[in-house]
């Protein structure tokens, strides 16, 4: 679908050859693969003084600027929550500061040495789906609301990825973990975590590396000392994907309170959504920021975040910083997309294999590594069922575009789409730069066959054809699809 659409963009692409630019911000989950896809389609981002330098060309990209159009897209990986705020305001000054380990998001050779130099913001990335609060914020405010100025909010899936658990490799005392099971095909270690183990660690009840549950799973004691669970502090779409899965998967898991207290307790994910209003009963649910006990002593209602199992938690802002903290903390385990760990990242930390619903129900004895193929199988269970009306509603895409507990053979159980959020109505800049055309041409490349290998080498999978069909149906809808030259009665975004 994407290949055909890209070929059909001939007129727009020819007009874009004058060399143009587009700018975005948001999710860190796909930051590396986005940079490589952008550099493959257009000119390579060079970075600038004091900022990350150029990123190596993807192995499955023939050369930089394969389109021959030159120009560039720059993307600042600042987290999904920040991206959403930037899009609503259409304000580049709200873009946060990316991690020092981020791919280049500036390019001094085109006069962009900081996000303050961006020529507007045309799109954002988010792994955290649009929710009702997002829609209320978009539609509220009368003539000053985003909807009144920029038209409808549009949300489309851009990539499929696994949320992988990377671990330090040493126990809490600094001794090398004693991992006995074989490494499965596509994995990077033999460390096996059942659903019960994952839920126990995340809820703070499995706190030691010699916990009997872990010992039984791995054919012997892994080590001793504390397990430190490292999480994100910022508004993170990766956290949404993790918590959306754990809320569903951990609901009926139970076990000992901790290694010294045999009282059986629930391992249901306990940490509540930080964004919920205090007037609403606080419940654990998939969210981009939750009330982790080390980050927030109390929730937004003033109630203490009780860590009854005594688990050890630590935190960092951004995927790169989280991985760095796991790397330097004995006994640590944390979560990020697969491209931050082995085998995708050379010299990276290893990842654990976890149990899927299929493996539990069928008693297969298998544990799934966080591969792009496993993530792709998980999202194959999310099939869109839209009509012309529901297709225009981002909440419909949110409802149908998640797979919190996939039940299919070979599926990796914590995976999801990373989304592009964009405007319906764009304006052509006074400097004649039509950023929407530039961005749309890149989107066509992302959905085409030429991008498949780039996704896969980074540990990601391409959005399946059934979703691409719906994306282009929306794009080709004259009433609800994006308009590159503005909409009647709308200021239009830039």
Q: Where are these predicted regions, by residue range?
A:
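Gram-negative bacterial Sec-dependent N-terminal signal peptides
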Residues: 1-17
């Amino acid at each position: 679908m994407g290949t055909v659409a890209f070929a059909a963009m001939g007129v727009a692409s020819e007009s874009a050859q004058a060399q143009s630019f587009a700018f975005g911000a948001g999710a860190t989950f796909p930051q590396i693969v986005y940079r490589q896809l952008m550099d493959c389609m257009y000119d390579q981002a060079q970075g600038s003084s004091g900022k990350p330098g150029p990123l190596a060309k993807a192995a499955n990209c023939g050369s930089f600027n394969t389109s021959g159009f030159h120009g560039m897209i720059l993307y600042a990986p600042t987290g999904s929550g920040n991206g959403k705020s930037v899009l609503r305001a259409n304000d580049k000054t709200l873009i946060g500061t990316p991690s020092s380990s981020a791919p280049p998001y500036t390019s001094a050779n085109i006069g962009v040495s900081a996000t303050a130099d961006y020529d507007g913001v045309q799109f954002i990335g988010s792994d955290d789906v649009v929710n009702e609060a997002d829609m209320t914020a978009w539609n509220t405010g009368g003539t000053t609301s985003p909807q009144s100025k920029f038209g409808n909010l549009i949300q489309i899936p851009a990539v499929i990825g696994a949320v992988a658990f990377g671990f330090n490799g040493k126990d809490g005392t600094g001794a090398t973990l004693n991992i006995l099971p074989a490494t499965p095909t596509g994995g990077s270690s033999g460390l096996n975590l059942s659903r019960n183990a994952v839920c126990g660690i995340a809820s703070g009840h499995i706190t030691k590396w010699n916990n009997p549950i872990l010992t039984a799973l791995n054919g012997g004691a892994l080590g001793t000392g504390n397990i430190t669970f490292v999480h994100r502090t910022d508004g993170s779409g990766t956290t949404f994907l993790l918590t959306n899965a754990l809320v569903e998967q951990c609901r009926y898991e139970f076990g000992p309170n901790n290694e010294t207290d045999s009282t059986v307790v629930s391992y249901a994910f306990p940490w509540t959504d930080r964004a919920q209003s205090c007037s609403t009963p606080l419940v654990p649910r998939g969210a981009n920021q939750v009330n982790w006990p080390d980050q927030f002593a109390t929730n937004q209602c003033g109630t203490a975040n009780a860590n009854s199992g005594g688990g050890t938690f630590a935190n960092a802002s951004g995927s790169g910083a989280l991985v760095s903290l796991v790397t330097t903390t004995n006994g640590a385990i944390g979560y990020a997309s697969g491209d931050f760990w082995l085998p995708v990242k050379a010299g990276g930390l290893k990842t654990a294999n976890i149990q899927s619903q299929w493996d539990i129900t069928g008693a297969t004895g298998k544990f799934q590594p966080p591969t792009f193929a496993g993530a792709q199988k998980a999202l194959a269970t999310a099939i869109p069922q839209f009509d012309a009306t529901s297709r225009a509603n981002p909440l419909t895409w949110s409802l149908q575009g998640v797979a919190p507990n996939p039940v299919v053979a070979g599926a990796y159980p914590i995976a999801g789409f990373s989304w592009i959020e964009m405007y319906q109505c764009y304006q052509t800049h006074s400097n004649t730069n039509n950023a929407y055309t530039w961005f749309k041409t890149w989107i066509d490349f992302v959905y085409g066959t030429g991008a498949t290998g780039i996704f896969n080498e980074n540990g990601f999978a391409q959005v399946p054809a059934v979703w691409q069909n719906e994306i282009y149906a929306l794009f080709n809808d004259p009433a609800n699809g994006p308009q590159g030259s503005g909409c009647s009665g709308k200021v239009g975004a830039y």
